[in-house]
């Protein structure tokens, strides 16, 4: 897979950008803050419908603009698809595919497949569980776009359930002794059923993904850091104890176990005013030997583990039949010689690689020799603020 052309309008620092891209390795050179990462972020947004840098859409829209536009023509095994996304900071985003408006932007998932490695990926190892959950969910949505809808539905149910637990605390505590309490408990039962059904689908997909990813993460880490302890990953849930009695389990067993745990935790949830059971509280244990990587890994081991997660993701998507686009955002300056060499080896075998770097010297020498294209990102101050420019001589 590769992107043949990319267009941006009012995306962050880019009032307008039109660039033709080719298979091979393309690098964007520009000083920090000039807007080079905004280019690859936009491609990643088109692939995942989310940014690797911010959690909301508002920062993606250029100051004083009503919306941002991202358009790309992707080529996959000779077939071209034109994806277009309109990002609205205060309303629902809109999308079209081959100039035909689609019902929801989620229909774009899978059109562009990317794997992005950036300094922010250290948070996969050192950060909060939400980072690791998102890592899994993004891969699942790329491979099974329908699951993005399941996850979105789960999040809506969770929000409604939490709102009930917060606003109807007194009624819930009174229980069936009052009409108000009985109504609140009946509503909670309804949300429990939906939370368990949707949550079981999310969890089953995560379990299945980690079963495939685990060996690839182990292999990637062993290749990158052969002198280190072996890497392993385990999915940690809020219902581990309930699931431990089953040697194998599917979504049905997970759903039943969730319902059992929700019943057991109901009083605590009413007292706390929040949902304590479900995939929104799960985590992925990243292990080096018999120790968790978080808190025990050295800086070099943390980089190796983060890189291994992305390489495993890339290899998994590739095994599905399509080379995803590999995006390397300002990472070579952060890696030691050994890790740089491993990454260059991978990049040389990928259909399309997009790289950002602050200066040309940040690139490894063996990478400079195989570049397909190089672009320079500069900036210009205008009456409406600083804007980014591509290949414009000062």
From Swiss-Prot:
Gene3D superfamilies found in the cross-reference section: P-loop containing nucleotide triphosphate hydrolases (3.40.50.300), RecF/RecN/SMC, N-terminal domain (1.20.1050.90)
Coiled coil: none
Molecular function GO terms recorded: ATP binding; single-stranded DNA binding
Keywords in alphabetical order: ATP-binding, Cytoplasm, DNA damage, DNA repair, DNA replication, DNA-binding, Nucleotide-binding, SOS response
Record: residues binding ATP: 30-37
Keyword Ligase assigned: no
Heme is among the record's keywords: no
GO biological process: DNA replication; DNA synthesis involved in DNA repair; double-strand break repair; SOS response
Main localization, broad class: cytoplasm
SUPFAM superfamilies named among the record's database cross-references: P-loop containing nucleoside triphosphate hydrolases (SSF52540)
Subcellular location: Cytoplasm
Source superkingdom: Bacteria
Secretion signal, residue range per the UniProt entry: none
Pfam short name (any one): SMC_N
GO cellular component: cytoplasm
HAMAP family from the UniProt entry: RecF
NCBIfam families for this protein: recf
Function as written in the Swiss-Prot or TrEMBL entry: The RecF protein is involved in DNA metabolism; it is required for DNA replication and normal SOS inducibility. RecF binds preferentially to single-stranded, linear DNA. It also seems to bind ATP.
Family indicated by similarity: Belongs to the RecF family.
Name of the molecule in the record: DNA replication and repair protein RecF
Organism: Corynebacterium glutamicum (strain ATCC 13032 / DSM 20300 / JCM 1318 / BCRC 11384 / CCUG 27702 / LMG 3730 / NBRC 12168 / NCIMB 10025 / NRRL B-2784 / 534)
């Amino acid at each position: 897979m590769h992107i043949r052309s990319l267009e941006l309008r009012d995306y962050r620092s880019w009032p307008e950008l039109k660039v033709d891209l080719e298979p091979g390795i393309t690098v964007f050179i520009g000083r920090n803050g000039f807007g080079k990462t905004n280019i690859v972020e936009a491609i990643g947004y088109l692939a995942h419908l989310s940014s690797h840098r911010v959690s909301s859409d508002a920062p993606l829209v250029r100051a004083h603009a009503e919306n941002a536009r991202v358009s790309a023509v992707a080529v996959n095994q000779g077939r071209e698809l034109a994806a277009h996304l309109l990002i609205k900071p205060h309303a629902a985003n809109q999308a079209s595919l081959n100039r035909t408006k689609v019902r929801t932007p989620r229909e774009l998932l899978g059109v562009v497949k990317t794997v992005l490695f950036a300094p922010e990926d250290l948070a996969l190892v050192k950060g909060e569980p939400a980072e690791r959950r998102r890592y899994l969910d993004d891969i699942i949505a790329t491979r099974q776009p329908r699951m993005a809808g399941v996850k979105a539905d789960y999040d809506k149910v969770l929000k409604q359930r939490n709102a009930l637990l917060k606003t109807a605390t007194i009624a819930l505590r009174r229980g069936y002794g009052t009409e108000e309490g009985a109504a609140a408990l009946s509503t909670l039962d309804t949300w429990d059923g939906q939370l368990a059904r949707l949550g079981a689908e999310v969890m089953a997909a995560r379990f299945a993904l980690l079963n495939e990813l685990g060996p690839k993460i182990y292999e990637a880490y062993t290749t990158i850091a052969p002198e280190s302890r072996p890497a392993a990953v385990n999915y940690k849930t809020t219902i581990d104890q309930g699931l431990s009695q089953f040697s194998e389990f599917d979504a049905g067993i997970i759903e039943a176990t969730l319902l059992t745990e929700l019943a057991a935790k109901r009083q605590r949830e009413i007292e706390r005013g929040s949902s304590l059971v479900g995939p929104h509280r799960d985590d992925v244990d990243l292990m080096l030997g018999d120790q968790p990587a978080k808190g025990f890994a050295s800086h070099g081991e943390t980089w190796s583990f983060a890189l291994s997660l992305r390489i495993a993701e890339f290899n998994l998507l590739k095994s599905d039949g399509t080379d995803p686009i590999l995006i390397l955002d300002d990472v070579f300056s952060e890696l030691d010689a050994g890790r740089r060499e491993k990454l260059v080896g991978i990049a040389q075998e990928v259909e399309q690689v997009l790289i950002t770097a602050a200066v040309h010297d940040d690139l490894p020498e063996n990478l400079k020799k195989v570049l397909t294209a190089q672009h320079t990102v500069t900036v210009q101050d205008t009456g409406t603020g600083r804007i980014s420019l591509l290949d414009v001589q000062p």
